[in-house]
Amino acid sequence: MSDRQAALDMALKQIEKQFGKGSIMKLGEQAERRISTISSGSLALDVALGVGGYPRGRIIEIYGPESSGKTTVSLHAIAEVQRQGGQAAFIDAEHAMDPVYAQKLGVNIDELLLSQPDTGEQGLEIAEALVRSGAVDIIVIDSVAALVPKAEIEGDMGDSHVGLQARLMSQALRKLSGAINKSKTIAIFINQIREKVGVMFGNPETTPGGRALKFYSTVRLEVRRAEQLKQGNDIVGNKTKVKVVKNKVAPPFRVAEVDIMYGEGISREGEILDMASELDIVQKSGAWYSYNEERLGQGRENSKQFLKENTDLREEIAFFVRDHHGIGEDSGVEDTEDATLQD
């Protein structure tokens, strides 16, 4: 053994003695090299994310204009975690959570942990306590813009508080990022959009809360309404584009197009039909959609209704779509230990 190797081994032993086993290791010694994920609740978004869902132990930012579907997207993720037997928490800083709508999206409101904090510090401390417990699989903070620092709440209207929220978020994320990774919790931060004053060239839009969240996020999703969906003269929903603007675990800039129906959330039938048509799993001839010579319906809406009534057929088509994109069934919710070394 060379002197360099002996010196390195001694240093590694000293580090493990001081900071505990697993504090330093070779990358190949990690028990899990494959990224563990939980489905977003949308097949189109799972494909756009590239790994079949949201990566566990990572920070996700979902931002977009008002009423674009940000909370709907995050509630579908909560419903998916609960469906797999996991624990979910919702920090409602906006004080705008609608339990009836959440229930329609499949959220079990009897099991969902809800906090409506008075200040930004309180909301982030509650989030930290839940993450450090290691018992929460997903936590949603709605929204970053509503995490108002205590000094601003206790001050007078018109008082200037420059950079307070950015400093609060920066400090919170420094503390949270390590705990989120160890506990394998998915932390979703919903954010709003603001416009910079005086921008002549480039995009004037920005997100509040400083730059820290942009850096700490593994995935950033931009949610925007594309067009209205109508049945006759009635507007029944929106076609929504979810763009993956940052992705550390797969190629970014993929776009998922989903139908968000009022009172129902993301239409599973709509996204399966669109994706299967693109892959020629479902054949389209004129206005008719068919699968294995079985006609699904005339027109997109009728075909969606047929799939809604025939769930076995819908899931069979979804299986072939997942298989084509190399996305298996969700990795699910597991009991994970902090130690990542093999015994």
From Swiss-Prot:
CDD domains in UniProt: RecA
The name this protein goes by in its record: Protein RecA
Entry-linked HAMAP family: RecA
Signal peptide, first to last residue: none
GO BP terms in the entry: DNA recombination; DNA repair; SOS response
Coiled coil residues, start to end: none
Protein source organism: Bacillus cereus (strain G9842)
Alphabetical keyword list: ATP-binding, Cytoplasm, DNA damage, DNA recombination, DNA repair, DNA-binding, Nucleotide-binding, SOS response
